[in-house]
Amino acid sequence: MYNKRNVESISNIDFTNQYLAQQSFEQVEFTNCTFTDISGTDFTDCSFIGCNLSNAVITNCKMYDVEFVDCKMIGVNFSDTKDFGFSVRFEKCMLDYTNFDNKKLNKSAFIDCKINGADFTQADLSKSKFTNCDLFGAVFLSTNLSGVDFTTSQNFSIDPASNNVKKAKFLSTDLAGLLTKFDIVIK
């Protein structure tokens, strides 16, 4: 991701009333910060640790090689970010009700995250990893899930007829999550 020796650290700052638009941050580690509007801001090789971005406005925000660790990001609309170079990684984050509609997220990583009610409609998640994630109520519709590994995640409901699931990985014990639309009982 980035070379930690050259990273600038910004900690314990509440950016709630600060205008960050048109600013660029490269190799910055934000720790325990709060953000409400980062529209038009560019982040390259940055890390957000323990930050609160819930309901933050991120319109036209650039995120290239950005990682989020232990962040609260409820209701964030990633569909509004710039598409070019979009590359993110999430670990131990709360991503409930986030929107990834039409987002290109191939090879992204979601590790130990709670992603309840998130919208992945028409997103490209090919070759992504969902490691130990709770996907209760997450919406997958016309989503590219080819090569995605769901083997350690739970509570998902995915219709194979409405999504590309070619070479996606599931545990046999989770097959019920693929058959939800049929309203059948599996024992």
Regions found by a protein language model. Give the residues of each.
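Tandem repeat scaffolds
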Residues: M1-K187
